Swiss-Prot record:
It comes from the Bacteria. Keywords: Iron. The keyword Iron applies. Monomer. HAMAP family: Fe_traffic_YggX (MF_00686). One of its GO terms (cellular component) is cytosol. Gene3D superfamilies: Fe(II) trafficking protein YggX (1.10.3880.10). This is Probable Fe(2+)-trafficking protein. GO terms for biological process: cellular response to oxidative stress. The lineage of its organism: Bacteria, Pseudomonadati, Pseudomonadota, Gammaproteobacteria, Enterobacterales.
Amino acid sequence: MSRTIFCTFLQREADGQDFQLYPGELGKRIYNEISKEAWAQWQHKQTMLINEKKLSMMNPEHRKLLEQEMVQFLFEGKDVHIEGYTPPEKQ
């Protein structure tokens, strides 16, 4: 049975995560406030960031940058800016 939460990203009720996907206090916040749908949107943006900026998850500075982008995207309403990328609907 899935959990329903109020997703702060989508601003509506949605299916919550099945388990905590990220460590620490931030992970608890994501588990309690971010839906599966919003997390999937973040994963798409995260993949683009890693690829376009050539980030390495072995590099602590790159992981910190990615975490900052994640917080801004999920909780502060700031879209991820990827230089040179234009979404298909805006071309």
